[in-house]
């Protein structure tokens, strides 16, 4: 049986010079967290697990040479200004990639048990996750973290890239590159770089240049000016100050929910599966017969959740007239001039779709109205809107920044929608002995009340989509009983 290395520090495959990389303003404005992906594989015996770990480890070493910024640590940039962050790469830079045998942990089911139950993650997030991901992101935090866990009959890879460095698209691209390098290690192929060559320094400088601003373009209504240190995207100096700020924000949120008559509870995560046939049927139902009202499958999927949740909650009876659905657009190809798809960074724009609640709550009109609202919001995006956001961030005093309005986040008639369907996590092979993951899961936190969140997972090999919803127990129960919703959706699993 091959032995497994106990040196968890992974260094770049080729020497990387010490350097400091200035990030862009959109990078600095990104959420300060490291979203963790879980990849599940069946594994036959410790020997296969050991071989898989060593392949992933050398694949990671190659990735660090391909994308050196991943080996760095986050720091304040120009004159300590929180709008300008940087990544410092030392001459001995490395990334920690831990493995752990957790097969004896009673709380963690066997691989077969997880597969039979839809791969829920209740109760063992802290055991599986890299330690770095369990605390707040602060000055000195690494740009990525990873851990491989051996369970009974399988393996679970938990890894994440700092959102400060990578938005959703870039996160997917980094995962694809790691998988490609690991696969080539398993095949005995010599190292070569696979990341597309991009003028990163020029792009970051462009994204940090104060744009010409059309003063007639208003800021999005879901944004608000916030004291910098109270914003959700503020980079704190240390864990203690970050935890204090988090506690203060949570207390404020709980007080707001209680004042609105809501009882805060532990958020629930429910996974639903949509087959290619049901997605096609859903799109046809949401589009109707008017050829001028074309919608995408994703518009229809968002419309289903948005309309059925609105109908169940019936918030128009409480005096609310409109609902907002916020989603993020990757604008690499929409900006003029475009940003190359291979660029690693944050190039997204938050967008909100608006729909009257009386239309959303209509059993016959809700799906079509919601889907059309999503389509119009997508089509209506303009570069001037993004430039207004960037201009405002760069023009505010140092002690102020832009953040998502807490009022929006805590209003239950609103919704978040996140589309990760184009990501290749479920279809990329990581080489022998692991191969293609059976399933992926993303570990995220949820609100104790307020707006529901919907996440579309990476497409499965058969074309199906899994979608997860953060919601209250009451909303979850109502969706189980909703005939129209269950006509399209198949329950997969749930966890807290």
UniProtKB/Swiss-Prot annotation:
Monomer. Pfam families: Transferase. One of its GO terms (molecular function) is acyltransferase activity, transferring groups other than amino-acyl groups. InterPro entries: CAT-like_dom_sf, Plant_Fungal_Acyltransferase. It comes from Cochliobolus lunatus (Filamentous fungus). Pathway: Secondary metabolite biosynthesis. The gene is clz6. It comes from the Eukaryota. Acyltransferase; part of the gene cluster that mediates the biosynthesis of squalestatin S1 (SQS1, also known as zaragozic acid A), a heavily oxidized fungal polyketide that offers potent cholesterol lowering activity by targeting squalene synthase (SS). SQS1 is composed of a 2,8-dioxobicyclic[3.2.1]octane-3,4,5-tricarboxyclic acid core that is connected to two lipophilic polyketide arms. Belongs to the plant acyltransferase family. Its EC number is 2.3.1.-. The lineage of its organism: Eukaryota, Fungi, Dikarya, Ascomycota, Pezizomycotina. Transmembrane segments: none annotated. This is Acyltransferase clz6. The active site is at 163 (proton acceptor). Keywords: Acyltransferase, Transferase. The keyword Acyltransferase applies.
């Amino acid at each position: 049986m091959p032995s497994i290395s106990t040196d968890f520090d992974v260094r770049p495959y080729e020497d990387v010079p010490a350097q400091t990389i200035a990030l862009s303003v959109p990078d600095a404005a990104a959420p300060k967290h490291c979203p963790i992906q879980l990849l599940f594989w069946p594994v036959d015996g410790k020997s296969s697990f050991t071989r898989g770990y060593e392949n992933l480890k050398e694949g990671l070493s190659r990735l660090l040479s391909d994308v050196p910024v991943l080996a760095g640590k986050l720091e304040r940039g120009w004159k300590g200004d929180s709008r300008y962050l940087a990544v410092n790469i030392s001459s001995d830079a490395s990334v920690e990639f831990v493995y752990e045998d957790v097969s004896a942990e009673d709380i963690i089911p066997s691989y077969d048990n997880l597969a039979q139950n839809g791969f829920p993650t209740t109760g063992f997030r802290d055991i599986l996750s890299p330690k770095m991901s369990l605390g707040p992101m602060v000055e000195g935090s690494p740009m990525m973290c990873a851990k491989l866990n051996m369970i009974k009959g399988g393996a679970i890879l938990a890894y994440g890239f700092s959102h400060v460095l990578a938005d959703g698209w870039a996160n997917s691209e980094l995962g694809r590159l790691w998988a490609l390098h690991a696969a080539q290690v398993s095949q005995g192929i010599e190292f070569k770089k696979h990341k597309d060559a991009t003028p990163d320094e020029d792009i970051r400088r462009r994204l940090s240049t104060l744009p010409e601003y059309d003063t007639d373009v208003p800021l999005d209504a879901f944004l608000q000016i916030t004291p910098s240190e109270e914003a959700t995207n503020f980079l704190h100096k240390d864990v203690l100050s970050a935890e204090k700020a988090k506690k203060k924000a949570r207390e404020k949120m709980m007080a707001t929910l209680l004042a609105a008559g809501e009882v805060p509870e532990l958020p629930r995560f429910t996974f639903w599966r949509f087959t290619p046939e049901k997605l096609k049927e859903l799109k046809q139902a949401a589009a109707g017969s008017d050829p001028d009202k074309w919608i995408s499958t994703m518009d229809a999927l968002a419309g289903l959740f948005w309309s059925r949740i609105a109908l169940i909650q019936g918030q128009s009876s409480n005096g609310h007239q409109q609902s907002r659905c916020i989603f993020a657009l990757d604008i690499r190809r929409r900006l003029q001039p475009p940003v190359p798809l291979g660029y690693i960074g944050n190039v997204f724009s938050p967008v909100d779709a608006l729909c009257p609640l009386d239309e959303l709550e209509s059993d016959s009109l809700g799906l079509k109205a919601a889907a059309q609202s999503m389509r119009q919001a997508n089509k209506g995006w303009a570069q001037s809107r993004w430039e207004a956001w960037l201009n405002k961030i760069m023009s505010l005093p140092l002690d102020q920044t832009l953040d998502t309005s807490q009022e929006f986040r805590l209003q239950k008639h609103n919704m978040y929608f996140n589309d990760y369907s184009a990501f290749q996590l479920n279809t990329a092979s990581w080489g022998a002995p692991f191969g293609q993951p059976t399933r992926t899961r993303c570990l995220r936190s949820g609100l104790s009340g307020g707006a529901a969140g919907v996440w579309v997972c990476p497409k499965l090999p058969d074309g199906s989509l899994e979608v997860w919803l953060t919601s209250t127990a009451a909303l979850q129960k109502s969706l189980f009983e909703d005939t129209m919703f269950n006509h399209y959706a198949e329950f997969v699993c749930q966890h807290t």
